[in-house]
Regions:
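Active-site and adjacent substrate-binding regions of carbohydrate-active enzymes
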Residues: 2-518
Length: 518
């Protein structure tokens, strides 16, 4: 099978970008605006706000009537849905896209043929298609319940009496009555629209690998939901059953057919490195997100001191469908600073539909309609500039390093408020980008020694890609004592570094100058 992918890095870039789309909500919007039978074929990719390396289309798989019915009756969920949609109607609740009855494209989305065409259209952009894989559980009405009940964790009458929120009694097609466990993690009650898969059963593991091999022909990568739950130590802690490792064998099986296939893990509990070692290409960086959200700049910087072999596999984000919207968590200027820290670090840069517009209302994966919200033009303008900066070849495929800020004068400790990076071409010691962020609610100052390597010119021109301001600094002073930086609260700068000769040549080419900032 030909996949017609661009001949660059296997994943588009060493530090690729990803855009998550709420497929069903997008389709509902199209259906309400003149195309009532719209499928994946009607999704106009040209309307997307940027060209990304990856597009993750959320919730394309077939779901069932049982999950839909549960979602429409669950009192707690209904409260959440009404907060999102005050005019909530039953048709807005389709059931969770993670309560899957079959890994075939949902019939309401156009089926597998429409999905194949979507993949071709994504490839035509020079991009790649990512879809969901939910390893921990299946929907209650999945065919395996009758065909292979041994694929699921089963319980007893005592289990369901002791924890009715975690078990369900079902009557099979043959008349047998069995008690099944809901899918869950060890810290929360079960997901009541799902059944827990039994990874202690080798036949179940084989069946899941067969699904993965099929999916590898239908997309280019998978975002693996709660991937750490099927690690043997976590599975045994939750269910008291020993199992063999799943991920190394599963990932190896897929990559033996498609070496360029991408596995991205949703993972928490400091298990990122473990899953990277088991074969995952990328793992969620929830720790950086949490530390930025909690304004812990020192802890965030310490996290970024980890080795590049770890950092380059991290997925940096400020929001996704599980988290509150970034514009709710982070005030305007703080969000901009957090975005520069997150997305100028190495790894995958993960953006969420609605993030660029400053949307504030989180949409449950059970819903297929979102609320009307106005666009925050200030946030939109910021992300437009940030995305342009992220298109730079050096930050997509170059080498990254974390820089330290020294005290600007005795007794001034605001240097601890800074996070700074340098980017250079692969194998080069010539810095091309300098990133400086004051992650604090007050003015801060520092000196940042800049390792300019074999830079031969006396003057360095620094062009701020977020403000278009231009600065000239002495190269020797930038080395020692360092570049003096004074920034206001939550202020960030992304500098493009050039020699004075390069800058003058560009001025002559465009026939003018922007002037110099101080």
């Amino acid at each position: 099978m030909s996949h017609n992918l661009p001949p660059k890095s296997p994943f588009g870039a060493r530090n690729p970008s990803l855009y998550q789309l709420n497929t069903r909500v997008w389709l509902t919007d199209i259906r309400q605006n003149g195309a009532p039978k719209a499928t994946l074929d009607e999704l106009d990719l040209s309307t997307l706000p940027h060209r990304f390396d990856w597009y993750w289309f959320l919730s394309v798989w077939q779901t069932g009537e049982t999950g839909q019915s549960i979602s429409r009756q669950h009192p707690g969920w209904l409260q959440e849905f009404r907060r999102t949609l005050p005019d909530l109607a039953e048709r807005d609740i389709a059931g969770s896209g993670f309560a899957i009855t079959a890994y075939s494209c949902h019939k309401d989305l156009g089926g597998n043929a429409a999905l194949a065409r979507l993949k071709d259209r994504v490839h035509a952009l020079g991009s790649r298609l990512m879809l969901d894989f939910v390893p921990n559980h299946m929907a209650i009405d999945h065919p395996w319940v009758n065909e292979h009940p041994d694929y699921f964790i089963q319980g007893t009458a005592d289990d369901i009496a002791a924890a009715p929120q975690n078990y369900i009694a079902l009557t099979l097609d043959n008349g047998d009555q069995k008690i099944f466990a809901h899918g869950r993690d060890p810290y929360f009650d079960g997901w009541c629209d799902t059944l827990q898969l039994d990874y202690a059963n080798p036949a179940l593991q084989d069946a899941m690998i067969a699904i993965l091999l099929d999916l590898a022909d239908r997309c280019d990568g998978l975002r693996c939901d709660m991937a750490m739950l099927v690690l043997p130590e976590i599975f045994e802690r939750t269910w008291g059953r020993a199992s063999e490792p799943f991920w190394p064998r599963a990932i190896a099986a897929v990559k033996s057919r498609r070496p360029d296939f991408c596995f991205m893990a949703e993972v928490y509990w400091d298990l990122e490195w473990e899953l990277q070692q088991q074969g995952f290409d990328y793992t969620y960086d929830k720790r950086l997100y949490d530390r930025l959200r909690e304004r812990q700049v020192h802890a965030a910087r310490e996290h970024l001191y980890a080795g590049i072999d770890y950092q380059k596999h991290m997925v940096r984000f400020l929001e996704n469908h599980d988290e509150a919207r970034a514009s709710v968590i982070f005030p305007h200027e703080m969000q901009k600073a957090a975005a520069v820290i997150s997305y100028l670090a190495p790894g995958m840069r993960f953006f969420h539909q609605g993030q660029f517009e400053g949307k504030r209302i989180k949409i449950s994966p059970h819903l297929v309609r979102g609320p009307e919200e106005s666009v925050d033009q200030n946030i939109r303008a910021f992300y437009a500039g940030l995305l342009e900066a992220l298109d730079g070849e050096v930050v997509r495929n170059g080498d990254w390093r974390l820089l330290a800020g020294n005290s600007a004068w005795q007794g001034n400790f605001t240097n601890e408020d800074f996070i700074a990076y340098a980017w250079s071409a692969p194998g080069s010691d010539i810095i091309e980008r300098l990133v400086v962020v004051n992650y604090a609610p007050h003015h801060s100052q520092c000196y940042i020694p800049i390792p300019l390597g074999n830079y031969q010119q006396n003057v360095v021109v620094l062009k701020d890609q977020l403000s278009d301001r231009i600065y000239e600094r002495n190269a020797w002073q930038m080395r020692d004592p360092g570049l003096y930086v004074e920034l206001g609260p939550w202020q960030a700068q992304i500098f493009k570094l050039e020699s004075a000769l390069q800058s003058q040549a560009q001025k002559q080419t465009v026939g003018g100058s922007n002037g110099h900032g101080r």
